[in-house]
Structure formats: structure tokens, C-alpha cells
Amino acid sequence: MKIICYCGSLRFKKLFEKYEYESVFKGEIALLPCCMFVDIEREYGALSDYKQKADEQHKRKIDICDEVFVINENGYIGESTRSEIDYAIKIGKPVKYMVS
């Protein structure tokens, strides 16, 4: 079973949902950013170090995946996503893009 780690801006929530849904039917395991479907600040209040910890955890997901898939609608890649792509390339993971 293939493990796909999805990366991209959280502004693309609907696209993350779409790709996660499709992964289920392809028999793939989808790894998504932390709390993809919860508004952390609204639900739990400001968490000062949450983003740093979530970013580090997402890199551990990249460590265990077979492939990284970048959700980059209109070619948009933010700073955090760029960091994840650079990390994936550094450790030899294949990286595919929604928009090339």
C-alpha cells in the first residue's frame, strides 16, 4: 500500500479533502498536515508553539511516506511548503505537483 504525504497551503483545504478522498479509493494511505480540518485558533485559542511542532511532525510524515504530493493551485507554494519540498528532496523522496 502506497503512502502519500500531501503538502501545501492550508488555504487549499477543499483540495486536501478531495485528494484524501481519492486516496482511499486508490488504496493509498494519505498523510495530511496536522489538524487539517480544525480551526485551531478558533477551537482551542492561540497556541504559540503549535505551528512549529506541527511543521516538525509533518516532516516526520515525509520521512515515512513513499511519495510527496504538493497541492499548489495556481502554482502557489508558500514558505512552509517550500521547506517541506526541500526536505523531501534532501532525503530522496519523489515529489509530484498538482500544477507543474
Language model features: what each stretch is:
Residues 1-100:
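Conserved catalytic or regulatory cores that recognize and/or transform ribose-phosphate-containing ligands
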